[in-house]
Amino acid sequence: MRKIIHIDMDCFFAAVEMRDNPALRDIPIAIGGSRERRGAISTANYPARQFGVRSAMPTAMALKLCPHLTLLPGRFDAYKEASRHVRDIFSRYTSLIEPLSLDEAWLDVTDSPHCYGSATLIAREIRQTIFNELQLTASAGVAPVKFLAKIASDLNKPNGQYVITPADVPGFLKTLPLAKIPGVGKVSAAKLENMGLRTCGDIQQCDLAMLLKRFGKFGRVLWERSQGIDERDVNSERLRKSVGVERTLAEDIHEWSDCEAIIEHLYPELERRLAIVKPDLLIARQGVKLKFNDFQQTTQEHVWPQLNKEDLITTARKTWDERRGERGVRLVGLHVTLLDPQLERQLVLGL
């Protein structure tokens, strides 16, 4: 049985800002967006969250909820440096590290000799070391599989950890809301609830063939996760291949003008996310994704060496006109595909 830890830094970007400027600690702050332009909140500290400010929230909405919110543009070099230090701490315990972003990662400590081989003690020691060396807090989840470790890391935030032992898994899953499974958004959860499916325990009673017929590949993922099945390894060779942002809509849209407005809102967040990795990697393609109300989806990409909003809008309009038919759209996404570092190096050498 594997021992997987998921580490998630608490309010990472905001925490770095508060560490470096203690005057910010007790006031509501958020990273991302500005009062002058449309954008989205990247991270908010806990004082801001008390007013309802959340990650990915439109800046205008955040300011309505918290008019005295302090908006910071973000210092990505500082965040990257802190992230590198955190990953150095991880490497003291295992070489099997799979970063998900600057502020979270999976660790496989199955064969780690540290802390008598106890994943619980390793997670606790890692969190304490992060605090001692960086004055930042982290939360952790410990479980036999990746998706449960990720869920667990969110159950005792901030600055805490939650352990799901192999013996705990059946009982934990029986009452686990389907909305907690990574990849199940609000709209999917609502559709499942309309079918009387609210928990993993409900899915356990379903026939796999029915789920496959109703939801396609997504149905198999639902069934496997509800059984506690997640055979994915912690992949230490994982490279960031793309950067994207998407929004699942509370109600389906049927007008192009609504889709265009969503793209206008998503684009600044895509710019922000790309800024984190762009200094190291080149863009190969950019594209759009539309998911329809029958759970089918389509992705359209263009070869394009730099981020370009007008091209994304043109691509989205073409996709909307050619692929939608009469179906409503329930998700809109933007993404860029990054050039493989080895190919990038070959191209540079060939110039």
From Swiss-Prot:
One of its GO terms (biological process) is SOS response. Residues 4-185 form the UmuC domain. It is an enzyme of class 2 (transferase). This is DNA polymerase IV. Keywords: Cytoplasm, DNA damage, DNA repair, DNA replication, DNA-binding, DNA-directed DNA polymerase, Magnesium, Metal-binding, Mutator protein, Nucleotidyltransferase, Transferase. The lineage of its organism: Bacteria, Pseudomonadati, Pseudomonadota, Gammaproteobacteria, Enterobacterales. The active site is at E104. GO terms for cellular component: cytosol. Poorly processive, error-prone DNA polymerase involved in untargeted mutagenesis. Copies undamaged DNA at stalled replication forks, which arise in vivo from mismatched or misaligned primer ends. These misaligned primers can be extended by PolIV. Exhibits no 3'-5' exonuclease (proofreading) activity. May be involved in translesional synthesis, in conjunction with the beta clamp from PolIII.
